[in-house]
């Protein structure tokens, strides 16, 4: 029994690729046919590749390592946040800031700043500050929360894998993963370069349902792996 069925993939529209003029020839092995100027992804390959990715992610989680979910495009933001939270993992769904992993000490400083402002709000400091100052601090807090809220408890040295929606959009994240030797699992559409990714899941990265289905499966893999880790203890 495969982790994702052909029926689920079809219903979520995972098979719809990009227009034929916007394609990467390296994706040819994953393309089934062309219909009305759009490439149709070979879902038998997706089933197989999703299984491989699932087993890898499960193993990473079982070893006690963390998985970082990354997807900043509109169609991915919600699923990335929800599934990372559900599986007790970390996420980036607004903007990948340069050095998020390769220069984590600087990022850590920004997270501390966020925590500092939050503390000021909680302990009543805001009540005694000038209104203008409070507005400025609230604006800064919102921006920091948007960009860093999903990685505030991240231990960058414990990231065992990165799950990405749309490697074309997240090329900076992939670059940092490469520098640090972190394997990348990704939903790869017909306009992407599969060679950038260690575990390719060929699929539609523009449909919310398709993204949600595959992202949820990766979260399931983490939860299954973590159960194994607890049992081993």
From Swiss-Prot:
Q: Check the record and name the Gene3D superfamilies matching this protein.
A: Glucose-6-phosphate isomerase like protein, domain 1 (3.40.50.10490), Helix hairpin bin (1.10.287.610)
Name a single GO cellular component: cytosolic small ribosomal subunit
Q: Which domain of life is it from?
A: Bacteria
Pfam families per the record? Ribosomal_S2
Ribosomal protein among keywords: yes
Q: Which terms in the Gene Ontology molecular function aspect does this entry carry?
A: structural constituent of ribosome
Describe the family membership recorded for this protein in Swiss-Prot or TrEMBL.
Belongs to the universal ribosomal protein uS2 family.
Q: What is this protein called?
A: Small ribosomal subunit protein uS2
**Protein species of origin:** Clostridium beijerinckii (strain ATCC 51743 / NCIMB 8052)
